[in-house]
Amino acid sequence: MSFTVYPALDIRNARVVRLLQGDYARETQYGDDVLPRAQAFADAGAQWMHLVDLDAAKAGGYTLAGTLGEIARATGLRVQTGGGVRSREDVARILDAGAARVVIGSLAVRNSEMVVGWLQEFGADRLTIALDTRQDADGIWQLPVHGWTEAADATLDQLAVRYARAGLQHLLCTDIARDGMLSGPNMALYGHLRALTPQLQVQVSGGARNLADVAAAKAAGCAGIVLGKALLEGHLNLDEALAC
């Protein structure tokens, strides 16, 4: 299995931002130079990037189709993107706009039966399921919903197995406690997922801060790692991460 580094840009109000643990009230802005940043990713040798529409994630209705198309045309990057995907039409529109892969998050938790149908319709290589998780007091990995205030009916383990059996290829998993904290990825979580669903290509997300974290994700047999805040704040050099 090859290993992919996904430099990431989260967009809100046409600006590059980062949220702490997904909290919209704890936002750091990094400017509105979206295309130049994407071009810099390509110039460093990246093949892929991860693009998130935070406005749509909150309100629904993907808003970055124009930006996505511009990035894909200008840079040649393959773009994995999501935010606010609520319907089959959303998936089709984002793919038509130039996405290589569409990320489906909360809907994948709320309506797995519908999303499984999309795997068959659009092809498993065109979709990434993104599951945000938090470990409860009993050590169970829950899937918080409704603004991360309640737990879904299914646990992370149950949903990962369900999707794996349905033919899912790409799973992006974020430990909420690590998201945006530069505290290192929770490699125990990813080791657990790899053992539970070895057929899935698991992407590490949340907490990456240095080359050692990239190397650890690769050594654990994960398929890739999403790098956001560490790149934006200069803790990590993309050229070195790509060569790791």
UniProtKB/Swiss-Prot annotation:
GO cellular component, one term: cytoplasm
EC number(s) stated in the UniProt entry for this protein: 5.3.1.16
Reaction(s) this enzyme catalyzes, per UniProt: 1-(5-phospho-beta-D-ribosyl)-5-[(5-phospho-beta-D-ribosylamino)methylideneamino]imidazole-4-carboxamide = 5-[(5-phospho-1-deoxy-D-ribulos-1-ylimino)methylamino]-1-(5-phospho-beta-D-ribosyl)imidazole-4-carboxamide
Cellular compartments annotated: Cytoplasm
GO biological process terms held by the UniProt record: L-histidine biosynthetic process; L-tryptophan biosynthetic process
Protein family membership: Belongs to the HisA/HisF family.
Name the UniProt record assigns to this protein: 1-(5-phosphoribosyl)-5-[(5-phosphoribosylamino)methylideneamino] imidazole-4-carboxamide isomerase
Provenance organism: Xanthomonas axonopodis pv. citri (strain 306)
Lineage: Bacteria, Pseudomonadati, Pseudomonadota, Gammaproteobacteria, Lysobacterales
Gene name, Swiss-Prot/TrEMBL: hisA
